[in-house]
Amino acid sequence: MNSPEIAPNFTHPDRNLAMELVRATEAAAIRAVPFIGRGDKNAADKAAVDAMRVFLGTVNFDGVIVIGEGEKDKAPMLFNGEHVGNGTGPACDIAVDPIDGTSLTAEGRQNALSVIAVSSRGTMLDASSVFYMDKIVTGAAGFGVVHLDQPIGDNLRALSQATGKPIGEMVVAVLNRPRHEGLIDAIRSAGAGTRLMSDGDVAGGINAARYGTRIDMCVGIGGSPEGITTACALKALGGFMQGRLAPKDDAERARAIAAGLDVDKVLDLDDMVSGDNTFVVATGVTDGGLVDGVRRKGPIIRTESIVMRGKSGTVRRVVADHLAAKWL
């Protein structure tokens, strides 16, 4: 039986990279566990950052962090522009979020993840000068049907017609923020239900694009780093996404323009990450709709991760048992 025509492009170093990245997110998630429900989000974040940094330093790639923990003078590790990896292997852009949902972790709530997104060097949008992004995410049915500039009611009706799913059965994920009060009212007035997220909009965006979930759409203003990470994931999921940078004030707008960003442009997937040579890995810190959180089972620590590869359009789940004595 002949191999698929695209198979020769799947190089072994690229395939192996996925498992190396999983080890980094697993380590970050495990190290955050002692801080779940303890009320100290900064301590949880530091533990995850420290663990991820160590593991990334051993990976066979030449990585540059495009989206990290902060500017070089504000974050000692995993800062924007930092080089990670051992310098061999593919040259990559990297987005890291050692904990997407530090508040969720500190409060012991669901949907906290440790996330890494990787793409070929020079393909990932550097949106670090603007903290927020307005976005809309759906499954593949959204292409040519919904648009960021359309009213939410029009988008819901269009997606309902495209999918054959009644609006009354549709669910829209939105961050539960005061800025979204009008948006939430409009969604409900159109007849759809809402899934209000306190944090962690990477999981919300991914679930909106995945087949067979309860989420049909994810909308609203969230973090621009989370937006770029979600875009990388959608390269594997085949979903639809648009975004627009949302500067919080005139100073941030000026900073974005100085960085060469068009803050008024509606960004398509290829504007956020070009090409399909992407990986996204996410390990659960706390339980959620995407993956289970870290669990202690006697002498074993169990982690669950999801691995999404854009080039092959493949989504895998990795369940790993770690000997607790090696970690605690």
Question: Where are the predicted features?
Answer:
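N-terminal subdomain of lithium-sensitive/metallo-dependent phosphomonoesterases centered on the IMPase/IPPase/PAP
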Residues: 2-95, 157, 161, 202-203, ...
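A short glycine/serine-rich beta->alpha loop
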Residues: 15-18, 39, 103, 142-144, ...
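Glycine-rich phosphate-binding "P-loop"
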Residues: 16, 136-154, 169
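Short basic, glycine-rich beta-strand/loop surfaces that mediate nucleic-acid
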Residues: 84-85, 114-117, 214-218
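DPxDG-like acidic metal-binding loop motif
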Residues: 89-100, 104-125
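A short, polar/proline- and glycine-enriched secondary-structure boundary/capping micro-motif
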Residues: 115-116, 138, 326-328
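Flexible glycine-/small-residue-enriched beta->alpha junction loops
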Residues: 119-147
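An extended, acidic
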Residues: 150-309, 318-319
